Structure formats: C-alpha cells, structure tokens
C-alpha cells in the first residue's frame, strides 16, 4: 500500500505539472479570507523568508490532513496539527465528530511507526507481560484478527490493569518468533526492516514492543458528499470553500 500511495502521488504531481499548476512549497496557510459569507482567498506565511502573502481566489480547498500530532504517540507527520480545521473553526465553522479518532493497535512503542495487520494475518500473536495471548479473552473466536478498534481497546485495557510490559507497564508484545525465519523474511520484509532499524530488535528471535497509536481523524471540517464545506448544523453551504481527505468529515 505504501508503494501504491507513492505511485498515486507521483502520477498526480506529474499531471499537475503537465497542466501548468504553480506550486508554492513551504508556505503555511494562516487564515482564510471570507467577505459577506463568500470565500476571497487565503493568507499564508512563507517559511524560508518570513514574508506574509495574500492569495486571492474564488475557491479554496482544505486538504490539510488529520491532527494526530495532538497525541503523544502518533503515526502522523509532525505537520499534522489540525491547522485546516482550526482556521475554519476560528471563522465560526462548527467542526464535526472531533471526538472520534482511530487508533492503530500495533505502532512501534513510543515511535508511532505502524506495523501492518499483515503481521497478525500471518499468525503474529499479541502477548502481555506474562506472555499470555490476551486477545483470546477479548475476542475468543477471531482473537488477534479482531478489528483495529477492538484490538486497541484490548491493549489499552491490559495496560490500564497493570498487564503491560516494560518498566512502566505501558506496552504489549507482538510475537512473530513462532512463524519461523523464512516466513518472516519472505512475507513480512517491511515490518522486519522497521523493527531492526528503529528498535534494534531481531523479530525472528524477540517479540516486538507495540502500543495503540493515534492514526486517523474521523472528524474534521463538515462537508457534504461534493466536498463543499457546511457552515452550520442546518447544512448551509459556505460558497467557494471545500475540504477533501482526512481534514474533511461527512460523518456517518
């Protein structure tokens, strides 16, 4: 999936270049200009020079991603602090579903680097400090293959009840050792590379310390199915303002 994302980004970038799109790299949007309820453009900060720029536009699309960096441990980039939703909130736009955030159950302890569900799909087992396969208690039929929310809650419960590992009892183990060296090398190469590089653990021989990691914002800027921003609970459209991707929220 990572390679697919890279290909998508490359193809979209090349398409923009072919259409003559101008990019303003390393600019930080500070504010949106709205006059009489209509979008007029944005105000941005040029990081390299410290200059403030005003961009006039009849339409603005917020695609600023999530806000995972409000959490201590997150898979998100450092830039994902909710600036897009924050700018519109300051303009009186009520944000939606902000209390809902997806936690990936198996981020590398303290680092937020995600270890794919493929590890558990291949037979990886989650264990607490005592070596117990605790998911048997939370999801007896599907065990470690339970959905993300169930597994994350189970890990959080184990930690809160004192069953976490380490000196602070704040992580559990993802155990791949029983899979064998060949299976791990052939089917889980990315995971093994991450673990060897960032925590200096050999997953063929040792279990991996993991913890629930803030991953995806369910809430954000309220939009309709056409990406148009809604300015109130009645679904009033804010002309010329759009949001797409993780910064947007169509609710459920």
Regions found by a protein language model. Name each.
Residues 2-9:
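Short, small-residue-biased leader/transition segments that mark boundaries at the very start
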Residues 17-29, 95-98:
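A conserved beta-strand/loop element that lines the FAD pocket in flavoprotein oxidoreductases
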Residues 24, 30-39, 44-45, 187-248:
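A glycine-rich dinucleotide-binding beta-alpha-beta segment and adjacent secondary-structure elements
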Residues 48-59, 237-240:
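Core beta-strand elements of the Rossmann-like FAD/NAD(P) dinucleotide-binding domain
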Residues 57-59, 63-64, 244-245:
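Short, well-ordered coil/turn residues at beta-beta hairpins
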Residues 62-75:
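Flavin (primarily FAD) binding-site architecture
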Residues 66, 103-108, 214, 247-252:
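Glycine-rich phosphate/pyrophosphate-binding beta-alpha loops
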Residues 87, 93-202, 206-209:
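An anion/pyrophosphate-binding glycine-rich loop and adjacent beta-alpha core
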